[in-house]
Amino acid sequence: MSWQAYVDDHLMCDIEGHEGHRLTAAAIVGHDGSVWAQSATFPQFKPEEMNGITTDFNEPGHLAPTGLHLGGTKYMVIQGEAGAVIRGKKGSGGITIKKTGQALVCGIYEEPVTPGQCNMVVERLGDYLLEQGL
């Protein structure tokens, strides 16, 4: 399966039991910041934004004082899983990023999608990739 198919079929799909509810944007990005696949709506990000995210996985709490920035949007960092998941909130939406062995699985949402639904979609694919050694 291509990386684009993972984004299209597993991240940008309807959320179980909520037809028509889906993430606003999604991507799979290598640890080096290279985009493996993304939705058409995923924001163009700066290398330093991705560096900040990568640093937070290695040094949990790094982003807390400044917030998580992606594509010029600032998210307030909320409870995640140190070294595994970063979650951010901005207004009625937010972001979930799951780290796998080789990549970062990113999902961005707005209402009516809930934070829990975004977490489920992103982390399910991230866990699958981890099981596959990716």
Curated annotation (Swiss-Prot):
At the top level of its lineage, which domain of life is listed? Eukaryota
Family the UniProt entry places it in: Belongs to the profilin family.
Q: What else is known?
A: The variability of the residues taking part of IgE-binding epitopes might be responsible of the difference in cross-reactivity among olive pollen cultivars, and between distantly related pollen species, leading to a variable range of allergy reactions among atopic patients.
Tell me what organism the protein belongs to. Olea europaea
The annotated subunit structure for this chain is: Occurs in many kinds of cells as a complex with monomeric actin in a 1:1 ratio.
Keyword list (alphabetical) reads:
Actin-binding, Allergen, Cytoplasm, Cytoskeleton, Disulfide bond, Phosphoprotein
Question: One MF term from GO for this chain?
Answer: actin monomer binding
Pfam (any one):
Profilin
- Name-wise, this protein is Profilin-2
Q: Give the main location.
A: cytoplasm
SUPFAM superfamilies hit by this protein: Profilin (actin-binding protein)
Q: How is it modified after translation?
A: Phosphorylated by MAP kinases.
The protein's role, per its UniProt record? Binds to actin and affects the structure of the cytoskeleton. At high concentrations, profilin prevents the polymerization of actin, whereas it enhances it at low concentrations.
Which cysteines are disulphide-bonded?
13-118
Matches recorded under CDD domains: PROF (cd00148)
- Modified sites of kind Phosphothreonine: 114
- Give a Gene Ontology cellular component term annotated to this protein: cell cortex
Location(s), subcellular? Cytoplasm, Cytoskeleton
**Which parts of the sequence form the motif Involved in PIP2 interaction?**
84-100
